[in-house]
Amino acid sequence: MQRTVSSRMELDLRGESDLVFSMAVAAESSLSSERMSFVIDGTAFEAQELVDRHGSRLHQFAAGPGSMLVEYSATVDGRADAAPADDLDPIIYLRPSRYCESDSLLPTARYEFAGLSGHDLLTAVTLWVWDRLSYVPGSSLVTDGASRTLMARRGVCRDYAHLVIALLRALDVPARMVAVYAPGLSPMDFHAVAEANIDGQWWVVDATRLAPRQSMLRISTGRDAADIAFLTNHRADLILNRLEVLAIVDELPTDDSQQLVQLG
């Protein structure tokens, strides 16, 4: 399997800013080529790369005011090994978090999924969220969490993932959020999915069913959207004028929603 991905941002920086970008594929990816550039008013800048415990690659630097262009591209051959699980994961990924209020959804989760566990539970939660939410671009706010999404019954990929994660955590299944490049996604964008830990293995869950999971390519991993944002900015304001994302695969797979799949 060969996957080619790219992303491009055009921004206006209104002052001195501390910027963190999360656009690069995760560290475990088998790269055959990669390029990343940061240009402000025609001058190129180098960013510091930081890698977290899950292989998320963050590019950080300080910049002054101006028009900024960020470009990233990569080609990945083959699949990476499945994400390892460690003893810290259940502690972190069973707790409620900013956008995944599993404590608030505990009664709902226990009522809807009583008696289910393992693969059956994962399938049931995925189908339940897919059946009850409508995918409506622009229908949610960046401050919305799983509880608000459930009440609104609509959202985008991050909202679907937050609700899946919150329900699974409420049922004592460690769950986390992953930003991915998703070949086959339409309209094309950065995509967010969930991962659930069943029997010591991380399995990818996408209740939107908008792209095959087998060809998704990990970017970053965390508790919820707060941990996997493609752009973080501190100090000055900025305007994101344009965002373009592309993800293609040499042969787009067919996804069976009942099948367990791991990101690779």
Model regions and ranges:
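Residue-level signal for pocket-adjacent positions within structured domains
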Residues: 56, 89, 145, 200, ...
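Hydrophobic/aromatic-rich core segments of domains that either
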Residues: 159-237
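Active-site/ligand-binding-proximal alpha/beta "capping" segment
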Residues: 264
